[in-house]
Regions:
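Conserved HGGG/HGGXW glycine-rich cap/lid loop of the alpha/beta-hydrolase fold
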Residues: 8-57
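Active-site loop/oxyanion-hole signature of alpha/beta-hydrolase fold enzymes
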Residues: 39, 49-86
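Gly/Ala-rich beta-loop-alpha elbow adjacent to hydrolase catalytic centers
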Residues: 89-93, 97
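Flexible "cap/lid" loop of the alpha/beta hydrolase fold
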Residues: 102, 111-137
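Active-site nucleophile elbow and catalytic-triad environment of alpha/beta-hydrolase enzymes
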Residues: 141-156
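Short beta-strand/loop motif that positions the catalytic acidic residue
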Residues: 160, 166-168
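Conserved alpha/beta-hydrolase "acid-adjacent" motif
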Residues: 173-178
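Catalytic histidine-centered segment of alpha/beta-hydrolase-like enzymes
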Residues: 197-206
């Protein structure tokens, strides 16, 4: 399916029934990274798995920023008349979900943030250096966005009042201090640092991801 917004065509897959959960992938990926997770969620949830602008089957554009992607998500939620969906974002998708919850809190019901960072300085130093080198050889809007955005402050996190699950690997390219800052500044946040996992290993292993998020999702259902 396609949603049209800002002169762009945004692809999304919709399946299942029940409370709505929106899945947001990371940089350079598309919605299929969640393929097996979608199968687990669909019997219990209405799943909306989105391809971000300039990714997957969505329109190509050089207008790439976390702000633009956040506006895309807000438009999608409003346009599809989704009522305070759960937002599950990985990496760039987690940044977008977090920015939406900060800027338009009425649009989100809960957050699952996997591998998010607040600023480029939140990446481990070796990761920043590697990205700069890669950008020098192969400059792209995607790489430029990662090197200069986002710019989220701890004070902004205080605006997030919805239930939030924060995930990161113990070997993540996001600095541990950054993940702790996110979790400690969101008032209803639950934190899990996953031993032995890197930035995306537990995401690619959708079965593991499902086991990680099930208790959190079940808790939301008990409080509805």
């Amino acid at each position: 399916m396609f949603f049209y917004h800002d002169q762009l065509r945004l692809y999304y897959q919709r399946c299942g029934s029940g409370p709505v959960i929106v899945l947001l992938h990371g940089n350079g990926e598309d919605h299929t990274i969640f393929a097996n997770l979608i199968e687990q969620l669909a019997p219990l949830y209405t799943v909306i798995a989105v391809d971000s602008r300039d990714h997957g089957q969505s329109s190509r554009t050089n207008r790439l920023s976390y702000d633009a992607m956040t506006a895309d998500l807000a438009a999608l939620i409003t346009g599809l008349e989704l009522e305070q969906p759960i937002l599950l974002g990985f990496s760039d998708g987690a940044i977008v979900a977090l920015q939406l919850a900060i800027r338009q809190p009425q649009l989100a019901g809960a957050l699952i943030l996997a591998g998010a960072n607040l600023t480029p300085q939140g990446l481990r130093r070796y990761s920043r250096v590697a990205f700069r080198v890669a950008a020098g050889y192969h400059p792209s809007p995607k790489m430029a966005m990662m090197l200069h955005e986002p710019q989220i402050t701890p004070a902004m996190l205080h605006r997030v009042a919805i239930p939030t699950l924060v995930l990161a690997g113990s070997r993540d390219l996001i600095a541990r201090k950054e993940t702790l800052t996110i979790a400690t500044n969101i008032q209803n946040a639950e934190l899990h640092i996953l031993p032995g996992e890197n930035h995306n290993s537990y995401i690619k292993d959708n079965a593991k991801l499902w086991q990680l998020i099930r208790p959190f999702l079940a808790g939301l259902n008990r409080t509805d």
